[in-house]
C-alpha cells in the first residue's frame, strides 16, 4: 500500500486541474463489442478477462511502448524499476541434477545464509526440483518477507540443508573500477537506486582525485528519468539537462537542470544501438555540454516518455462514480482532483502510456533519430557470451587452489571462457572443470600446469584479458586510450 501511495503521488504531481471536454461517448458501442467478443470467441472468457483483452488491444496498438498490464504484470514492472524485490537473491539455471545457482547477489539473504555460486538445489522445503524449470523452482522459493525456506544443496563436499530467511534483495545497477588514472563506470539501467549506487562510485573517485571517467551505457534500456537526471547532475556542468514536453494540458511540462559549477570531469561515453531512453538523456546531456564525447554506434532513438496510470475495476468505477458523481478511470485522477486514495482491491491493473517527448540541452528531438557518436567505431562482440568490459583484472595475492571461492575465481573463468578454454558457467568456485581449463591455459603459455592460479598465471590471464579487449571491444579500448592521452 505504501508503494502504491508513493507511485500515485508521483503521478499526481504531474496532473493539473485542467479537464478537457469528453469526445464521443462510445459506451454502448464498446459494451456491444465486448459482448460480441465473449459470445463469438471460441474459448470461454469472463467479463474481467474480456475487459483486459480489450484494454491490451486498445493501448498496445498505439506504439511499441504503451500497453495495459494486469496487477501481476504491473508488480513485475515495478520490481524491475525499483531495483529490489523480496526473495533470497539468487539466479538459477537448469542442470542434470536439478537447478543450479549461477549467481548469488551481494549482501543478499542467500549470501548471508551461506549459499554459493554453483550450488545445486536438489529440493525446496523437501520437495524435489528434479525435472523442473528454474522459473518454477524460483516460484517455490519466493514468499513473504521474514519467512524461511529450506534448500537442500549438493556440493562437491556433500549434501546439506540450508535455511534462508526471505528478505529484501537490492540489485546494484552500477559497477565500477579504477584503471590507473581512469574510472570505468558501467550503468546497466536507471532503476530507483541507480543514482545512489553511482554516488558511491563517485565518492571513491573524488577521494582518489580522479577526473577521467569512461562511462559505459551500452545496452542500457533506460528507466526512470529522475534517476538519469540525478546522475547527470553529478557530472554535467550547470545548465539544462533535458526538457519533457507533454501533449495533454493535464500534464505539466518539466525542465531539469544541473547546478554543478566547474565540473572537473572529462568523460568518454560508450554507446550502441541499444542505448535508449533515459540513457540517451544522460548521453545527450554530456554531449551537448561539451564535457565528453560519445564513442561507438548511433543510439536507439527513443525520445518519448511514458507514465504509468493505475486503472479502476469496473466495479470500483461504478462505486466511486455513484458516490461522487464523477467518472475517472485512473486512480491518479481521483487522488489529484478529489484527494481520494484508492484501495489496491479497486485496481484492475495499469496503463503505460506514451505521454510526451523530451529534448536535449541543445533542443534536439531524438525520437527515431538517436544520438550520433562523436567517434564512430564498431560495436563490441561477446566471445562465448562474455562482456569483456565488465571483467575485473585478477588481484589475488595468494594462490587459488581447488575449492577456492571468490570474485577472482569468477573473473578468471570469464577470461578462460572468452578465450575458449572453459565451457561452463562462470561462478565463484574453483572446481575440477575450472582447474582443467587453467591447465590447458598454462600449458599453452609455458607455465607449470598445476591447475592453480598463482602469481604467474594471474598475470598471464590479465594479459590475455587485455588482448581479448583489443580484439573484441574496440570502443572500450578507444575510450580508454583517449582518456589516458590527456
Tell me what each language-model feature is.
Residues 122-210, 253, 367-398, 465, ...:
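C-terminal, low-ordered peptide segments at domain boundaries
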